[in-house]
Amino acid sequence: MENRRSFLKKTAMAAAAAVAAPVLESCHTTPSPAGTLIVPPAAGLPITGTFLDEISHDIPHQNWGEAEWDRDFRYMKDIGIDTVIDIRCGYRKFITYPSPYLLKKGCYMPSVDLIDLFCRLAQKYGMKFWLGLYDSGKYWDTGDMSYEVESNQFVIEEVWERYGRKYDSFGGWYISGEISRATRGAIESFRTMGRQCKEVSGGLPTFISPWIDGKKAVEAAGSALSKDQAVSVEQHEREWNEIFDGIHEYVDACAFQDGHIDYDELDAFFSVNKKLADRYGMQCWTNAETFDRDMPIKFFPIKFDKLRLKLEAARRCGYDKAITFEFSHFMSPQSAYLQAGHLYDRYREYFGL
């Protein structure tokens, strides 16, 4: 009986190993030789930063703990990512750290202090961590960004005292309100929050990441993939010239999201973005979306060639840095989406990593 049990146990273990092996191997694949490419390799601007979307708006949570996050930071480091950006430290009632102020306002207590975790992992892997400000949701409800200033006055102070003074990896601030056009209260709100971020932290840099109101700027919850009324390059330039003129003293960089315009429009909009940033002494980044806006199911990892076209346009237009939204869901070998690990491999092939 004992021999039979041992035999069955060994058989079951062997079967489990056979099933698990392809899954585990897929997380550690070796990219194919770059010689298989029929386009010039490494012609795009490499991605050196990523958002961390742990207070998710419309993407499923992966429910990672410290071990999974540690592994993901290592995957990021292996392809040259040196900047990680918490996209928001809270959204409505869900928060990433035990904020005394926000808890008193009725927010829910988080089970883990993610800001501390991200700062520690950034320190471990030689990266810089940027803190995304709190999003109360009132701007999305009203269209008036000035509502976001009040809560963030307290959040900025809290975060700096808890993490900024503690970790050398704390490297900057992301002013998380997203706009695309002239928006009520936006200029003054960006100025106010940017100024406070700089004052409490001794001048650490700040950035914003707006979207371009192009043909793909549609409601994420809707079924439409495009719209007829899209901003022209000329109108985009006029409106963002006014915005940059009002915020450039306290906002150091602008990373326009690149997924709302078509691929044959990239150079026209990107060149305007770079011209405006240079005019006002700001850095011009691209937020290279690694999810696909062209698919009827929202959202899956992007086709590699679409990402390549966007990164190549950013390099042609002289952009300063490429960040992405976002590595962990759409590009990581351990993402819940199988396609993400394949995108990681194609990216490594293209850049010879």
What label would you give each PLM region?
Residues 35-353:
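Glycan-processing catalytic domains of CAZymes
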Residues 1, 23-43:
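C-terminal segment of N-terminal export signals and the immediately downstream linker at the start
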Residues 8-28:
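N-terminal export signals
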Residues 1-8:
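Twin-arginine (Tat) signal peptide motif
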